[in-house]
Design a protein with these regions (language model features):
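Transmembrane helical core of 7TM receptor-like proteins
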Residues: 1-288
Length: 288
């Protein structure tokens, strides 16, 4: 039985079609959140690149995270040519963020526990290597999981009970035994979620007493991202209500990217100072 390629014209994205009264509120909520996502992440990227005082590894990784969140939110708000293209990109970005959050925790651990050697250990070359590893691991996992999903036959099934093309929803559309796909997804997701999460908890466990104020923002972002991911991916398929799964997915792919730059900015004096200097320079340049 041959597989059927999925393109937007081939099937219907259901979303919350059982609750039509949610259409208009959801439209405006998603539009506003997407605009804040663009504004917040672009501002953080801009000040990190233009301000000479924000050239440390911390802001290198924050810039990387903001770029990732911009792509993440855009992937789930703008329709791509085909459903599979969206699935590949969405899964790639999600896996990359899992690994990148772990790398950022390692950076904080080195900064607090080894401050005298921090600039040597976390030099620019090493930061780029860690960032590249996160992106490559996410890409490799996306190629594996999405390719396995593409090959599943649909047997005429055209209704995808989701907002966009995410792998668990696509697997449920198949008309054959998907045990291998579900097991592979669960095993790899466990590794990619619990591996970085364990590294984060271990890193912050070592420095919690000495510098909790430097970690609280990152821990908040971690809880917002990993909490829904653990619930959605690390349980047997079909055990959770689909509406709850959709709501949690919407939370971590829309709300989290919007919240990340504000969480980091509002609790970071350096970033707030850089924003003020950037605005002051812009105002003075217009006067001149």
């Amino acid at each position: 039985m041959s597989s059927k390629l999925l393109f937007p014209e081939d099937f219907i994205l259901m979303g919350f079609t059982k609750y039509p009264w949610l259409d208009l509120p959801l439209f405006f909520a998603l539009l506003i959140s997407y605009m804040f996502t663009l504004l917040g992440n672009m501002a953080l990227i801009l000040v990190s690149q233009l301000d000479s005082q924000l050239q440390s590894p911390l802001y290198f990784f924050l810039t990387d995270l903001s770029c990732l969140d911009l792509c993440f939110a855009t992937t789930t708000n703008i329709t791509y040519i085909g459903c599979m293209a969206q699935a590949y990109i969405f899964h790639w970005l999600g896996c990359t963020e899992c690994v990148l959050l772990g790398v950022m925790a390692l950076d904080r651990c080195v900064a607090v526990c080894r401050p005298l050697r921090y600039s040597v250990i976390m030099d620019h070359k090493h930061c780029r290597r860690l960032s590249g590893t996160a992106w490559l691991v996410g890409l490799a996992n996306s190629l594996l999981q999405s390719t396995l999903t593409v090959q599943l036959p649909l047997c005429g099934n055209q209704e995808l009970d989701h907002f966009f093309c995410e792998l668990p929803g696509l697997i449920k559309m198949a008309c054959v035994d998907t045990t291998i796909n579900e097991a592979t997804l669960a095993v790899v997701a466990t590794f990619l979620i619990m591996g970085p999460l364990s590294m984060i908890l271990l890193s912050y466990g070592c420095i919690a007493q000495a510098a909790f104020h430097t970690c609280s923002s990152h821990l908040l972002v971690v809880s917002l991202f990993y909490g829904p991911g653990i619930y959605i991916y690390m349980q047997p398929s079909g055990d959770s209500p689909q509406d709850l799964t959709k709501a949690l997915t919407l939370f971590y792919c829309v709300i989290t990217p919007m919240a990340n730059p504000f969480i980091y900015t509002l609790r970071n004096k350096d970033v707030k100072g850089a924003l003020r200097r950037l605005l002051r320079s812009a105002i003075l340049s217009k006067r001149i």
